[in-house]
Amino acid sequence: ISDSVALPPNQPEVLLAGTRVAVFEQGTGELWLVNAAELSTFDAQSDSTLSLGTDAMVSMDSAGTLFAYSPSAGLVYRVNTASSDGVDSSQSVTVAGTSSSRSISSVGGHWVILDTQTDSLLVDGRTVDLSAELGTGTGAVLQWPSVDGDRVLVGYSGGLVAVSLGSGAVSSLVTDTAGSPARPLTLAGCDYAAWSNGQNWRRCGGASEGATAVLASMPGTARLSFETNGARAVLNDRRSGATWAVQRAGELIDNWDEL
């Protein structure tokens, strides 16, 4: 590591999209938008781009489309960071639950907010009830932001569901798993899901059904996350550092040169 940047002190989060960077201070709701080339000179004492208030949430896809939910304003803001720092549009919303039970993402330019307290999903402001599909499952998580797609994936301890962005119809894709889920991922025409019991699911090219595999050497306490670089993705356990090649046969990566 040759350089470091002083980030805001209150729960900072950094989102990257091409040449644009969003620095979000979760504790205060302050959001800065900067060029990646200028990140080394970022000053957390400078005026923020947006002040979203406490308990706000942000999400940005790889094209730089950012959505931000401000509970204090009761609005979801859309910002096309690739072309402007200004708000493109806003939508009035009412979100149930608490800040700890809510999360935000986007698919194909549509924002979605999941509330795990009520097992409900807001899709562009329309509420979709997921309680029947999630049942007694726990730990529901929204998929990572995706530039493309016509439905959003929600993983939970018992499986995986998809919700149509157009109709709100809910379909169960996986129903027989267990463990803590990773945030599902849609990338380069494929959907991915994984759980800490070692089960991994992948579907590509619009196939009607996905393929399930068991990943070797998965710790039961794994904290899983799909990590991406362009069109490449791996599954990583943030606790142990173990990584699996989910775009191949799901093998544990112990030689990066061979990969």
Protein language model annotation of sequence segments:
Residues I1-N10, T28-S51, S72-G97, D115-G137, ...:
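Surface-exposed loop/turn elements that mediate protein-protein interactions on large endomembrane-trafficking
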Residues D3-R20, Q26, Q45-T65, S90-H110, ...:
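Repeated scaffold domains used in trafficking and secretory/extracellular systems
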Residues R232-A233, T243:
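A generic structured-segment signal
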